[in-house]
Amino acid sequence: MKPQLLLLEDVDGLGRSGDLVVAKPGYVRNYLLPKGKAVVASAGTLRLQAKLQEQRLLQAAADKEESLRLAEMLRSIVLDFQVRVDSENNMYGSVTVNDMISAAEQQGVVLTRKNFPRSHSGIKNLGRHVVGLKLKEGVTADLHLEVRADHEIIEQKELQSAEEQEG
């Protein structure tokens, strides 16, 4: 019989802090117990469970508030990417998750790879794109991107300078 464990930290795929869980013996012996992520449930640790769950609820409320604030910030931001293209407007490479994270940081928004869906492999086309993000506590948000070719940027700057010279 597998022993019950009390999680001391959130563990992906297993549970959250304060949960009573059952896991495979090797996972328990080689990962959860040595890393201090769980303890074997006993009468004493069950009293600890209530305290951990209370802390988790407070942390969850703070995380949700932060996620809602971040989602609100993302509504007003459009990340602009300038990429090299060939004569047929095919991009060289793609706009990757790391590119999006870096551009968001420049706008004052902190994102991580965990916020992006695992299936997202990058953007390979010009135009406007919306990437769905998964924030903490089940909050979702959309990241708006505009991918433009370098020559479009150059043409816009030339038009602006021509308008300034005329006016």
Swiss-Prot record:
One of its GO terms (molecular function) is structural constituent of ribosome. The keyword Ribonucleoprotein applies. Gene3D superfamilies: Ribosomal protein L9, C-terminal domain (3.10.430.100), Ribosomal protein L9, N-terminal domain (3.40.5.10). Keywords: Ribonucleoprotein, Ribosomal protein, RNA-binding, rRNA-binding. It comes from the Bacteria. The keyword Iron-sulfur does not apply. Transmembrane segments: none annotated. One of its GO terms (cellular component) is ribosome. Binds to the 23S rRNA. Belongs to the bacterial ribosomal protein bL9 family. This is Large ribosomal subunit protein bL9.
